[in-house]
Amino acid sequence: MKYKGLTKTTKPFSSAAALLVLAFALFFSIVSPVSAAPLHDESPAGMPGLTLQEFAAQLSTAPQGKPAGLYVANTLALPIVQQPAGQPGFVSSQAGVTTQFGMAEKYGTTGLLAHNTLAGAEFSKLETGQFAALVYSNGETRHYRITAIDRYIASEPRSAYSDFLDSDSNRITAAELFKRVYQNGDDRLVLQTCIANDGIASWGRLFITAEPVTELVVAALSQAAGAVQMTSLSMPLAK
């Protein structure tokens, strides 16, 4: 990918927009972890050898209506923690977990955040066509298929108000990027982490988007009973 040169611009922000940008752009700041939905035996959460059923059995109870774990066969199995009230930029610094992005939930999207030095490193291993599952404490499992992987460069990596460049060198604000990624709703799943480059931990952003799949796909996965490696299957998306 080729990116054009960057120039600094200054734009006015309303207080609401500033809050959104701070929540979206500052999530990579390391903060103290919260304790929620850990694995009972504290085994490595990213261990790809776990089956979905084994992973679900090890999860602790999550808040009502919240996902307790993220699972991608042969790739990752991560418990999910929640952001503390009033901390929209919080991302856990606990190894082997991912954090649900509360602001994204308001727009019908399940957003999961992780530092690229921790569980976010597992996100970079994912590929389009793979299936992901969200596990809930009540036994419910929601299945998704990864449909897009997008990368953006921060024009000012150390600024909370940085603009971003997409792969075509189009420049957009953090608020515009948030809208593009999270405000489409439709029960999408989005995984977000930072991209490190040239010694800068927050040089860019990685977004992995997954769409809900039909009951037909869920049935096929159940029949496979773990024998099928869930990669690059051509299945219809839910409507």
What are these regions (language model features)?
Residues 14-17:
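Alpha-helical hydrophobic membrane-insertion segments
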Residues 19-29:
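Bacterial N-terminal signal peptides
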Residues 29-37:
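Membrane-interface motif at the C-terminal end of an N-terminal transmembrane signal
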Residues 1-10:
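N-terminal secretory signal peptides that target proteins for export/translocation
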